Amino acid sequence: RGFMTLLLQNALQEMYDRGIAFSTLIPAEDWLFGYYAGQGYVTVFDYALHTYTPANQTIPHTLSLTTSDRFDANFARNLFPYFDQEMSKRNYCIQHPYNDYITIVEEAYLSEGQLWATYRQNVPTGWALAVPEKDRVCVKELLFDTEQEKTELLQNIHAFWPDKTLVYKTLPAVSG
C-alpha cells in the first residue's frame, strides 16, 4: 500500500471513530479525481473545462486589474469579502472560511500561481486564481460580475503565460 492510501484510510477510520458521517475532498489536480474514486469518493460538483482562445485583437482595458508576483496577505485578505460573496451565490459549493481561503491562495503561490482581481472604482468585480502546470495554466476559480471582467481576467492571465494553453472551469447551468 502506498503512503497516500494508508493516510486516507487512517483519516477515514478516525472520522468513523468520532462519528463523522460526511467528509469532502477537493482534488488539487485532475488525476486525483480517479484516485479518490478508487477510495470510495464520488464527484458531486460537475465543472465543465474550457480552453481560452484569445480574440484576434486585444480588448481595451477599461477596468483596473491587479496581481502580485508573490503571496501578499493584504491583497488576499482584501479580496476575501468579494470571494465569499460570490461563492455564496452558488447553488452548490464548499464555502471556505477565511483561514482556508488564505491557505488555498498561499498554496497557489507556492506552485508559482497568482491571484488576479479586477476593480471598478476601487471595488472588486472579478477574482481569478491561476496556477501553471506542465503544459497549461489552470484557472482554479474564476469569479466575475460581468463578461467584461471574465474576458479581461482571462486575457491578462493568458498574456502572462503566453506559451501555455489556458483552461478554466465553469459550473453547469442549474435548471428549475
What are these regions (language model features)?
Residues Q9-A11, P27, M87, I102:
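Residue-level detector of functional hotspots within protein domains
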Residues R1, A11, S23, P27-A28, ...:
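Small-side-chain structural scaffolding
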Residues D17-F22, A28-Y47, A173-G176:
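Conserved active-site alpha-helix within GNAT-family acetyltransferase domains
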Residues R1-Q13, G38, E147-H158:
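Conserved acetyl-CoA-binding loop-helix of GNAT-fold acetyltransferases
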Residues L8, M15-A28, W161-P172:
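Conserved GNAT acetyl-CoA-binding A-motif
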Residues V42-L143, E147-T151, Q155-N156, K169-P172:
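Amide-forming acyltransferase catalytic core, primarily the GNAT-like/NAT-type
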Residues T5, Q9, I26-D30, A73, ...:
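Short, amphipathic alpha-helical segments
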